[in-house]
Amino acid sequence: MVHWTAEEKQIITGLWGKVNVADCGAEALARLLIVYPWTQRFFSSFGNLSSPTAILGNPMVRAHGKKVLTSFGDAVKNLDNIKNTFAQLSELHCDKLHVDPENFRLLGDILIVVLAAHFSKEFTPECQAAWQKLVRVVAHALARKYH
């Protein structure tokens, strides 16, 4: 089990309360698909992903990005039980979707970039450290079924 300090919890929940889930989720997923184009193979049903412009304008990318970040919000609400919070999603991504678990880490790193861009003044080194810890824990929880 992960130990969260009171300060880490406050930093994470404080910033999360300001996050526009639709915009940041869409941007994070779009960046993942652009920066790591091999991840596009998991989204073949999304239509045109042929260029950064197409990806950024794709409504299915936007909708799924919001869904992903909404799910990430479940981690913020359940910091002391992230493993169980993501048990079903881990099973889905492993057994049905066959997603490489490394992609969870990549998306977490992208989310850090997006949050830093949107909250530059508030995204202090302490804030980054807390969020980096959170995305690592979420990525590990999502990869749990693979082990």
From Swiss-Prot:
Any one Gene Ontology BP term: hydrogen peroxide catabolic process
Domain of life: Eukaryota
Keyword Transport: yes
Tissue expression notes: Red blood cells.
Protein's job: Involved in oxygen transport from the lung to the various peripheral tissues. The beta chain is a component of adult hemoglobin A and D.
PANTHER family: HEMOGLOBIN FAMILY MEMBER (PTHR11442), HEMOGLOBIN SUBUNIT EPSILON (PTHR11442:SF7)
Protein name from the UniProt record: Hemoglobin subunit beta
